[in-house]
């Protein structure tokens, strides 16, 4: 089951793909031809209804001529550790 955070991530990634594609003047069908991914599958990704594999995101990014991270970025310049990571830390056990 997909939780709310995952739904938001999928919707955000889809939005960035759609905005990048549209900004480059590409139709969904044109991107489909460039990636080898069907237009209906791309539509599901763009609307956040399908969870694309990393290799699929790479194909889309390559076709759009952007780094794959661009499609995953949330607009912030820095990555902040989550509250649980900083308060609980990590148990490295035998790796220390």
Please state what every model-predicted region is.
Residues 2, 73-96:
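Short, charged recognition helix plus adjacent turn
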Residues 36, 55-70:
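DNA major-groove recognition helix of helix-turn-helix/homeodomain DNA-binding modules
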Residues 33, 44, 73:
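Phosphate-coordinating loops and pocket residues in cytosolic domains that bind phosphorylated ligands
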Residues 36-51:
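Recognition helix of helix-turn-helix/homeodomain-like DNA-binding domains
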Residues 1-23:
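A short, Lys/Arg-rich alpha-helix, primarily the initiator
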Residues 15-34, 59:
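Short basic helix-loop element that most often maps to the first helix and adjoining turn
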